Amino acid sequence: MIGQHLLADLYDVASDRLVDAGLLADCLDEAARRGGMNPIGPPVLHRFEGGGLTGYLLLSESHIAFHTYPEHRYIALDIFSCGGGDSKAALSVFLAALEPGREHLTTAPRGAEIPQRD
């Protein structure tokens, strides 16, 4: 196995938080730090006409990325680590900052058919 991909669907998030680029950029940085992951550059964010944001942070272990839909009070969050990072600790940063009313989490093994290295 290459790594774990944590997919988080966060619902019922205050719309103003989902358009706050500063807050979400800080979440990316803090999530990497808390998860013991190593950024290879600064967070990158793009704002769309409707106010939604897409952002990502490239990591030496892979990436953290999100897409916000403020009109639906929803954020899709991906945390993929092919190293020793703690994806759940990284997720906790977003949960604390965004305070979703509901969440749906899925963890997917990536490269499951590839033998683990020693």
Model region roles, listed by residue range:
Residues 1-118:
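Polybasic/polar functional segments that serve as interface/processing modules
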